[in-house]
Amino acid sequence: MLNILNPTDSTSRYTTNIDGGSHWSVLVRRGVNLRLTDLEGGANVGMMFYNPVWLSERYNAPDTLKCQHTFKLTQGNCLYSDMGRIFCSIIEDSFGWHETMCGNAHAQHVSKKWGGRDYQSDRNAWQQNGYDSFLVELAKYGLDRTAMVANVNWFSEVSADDNGNLI
């Protein structure tokens, strides 16, 4: 079943907790405020944006950053589509820095950093990498890897070392 958030009542609330390593998607209608909260610190929420009426209209990270002369996303910034329309704006931000350039983790990155894991061994404690999680959610809307776009990583600050490598 597709989750849809509608701006029907200013007092209505929908709350869901998303465990680390899991994935979820929702259709957010115009006029809805979506609040993300890092309950324990150290969270990262990877998020992609599409026009629900015309799925070929997608989030455009380069234009989002370029037109606002910024590298980070924070309060006051807007997220733009590849058609030049605003998908959403950041109206409040207590973290102060969210990035949209580093993408998401692939299976080989996760395995290299944390070791190989699979459902057969870990059962319900198994966690999927970001790339494969996005593919699962895209499939729910009839999309595949060709529809993968840049994502925003909420609660993730990125800086550069002396050699220009992003860390």
PLM features: residue spans?
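Acidic, Ser/Thr/Pro
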Residues: 1-167
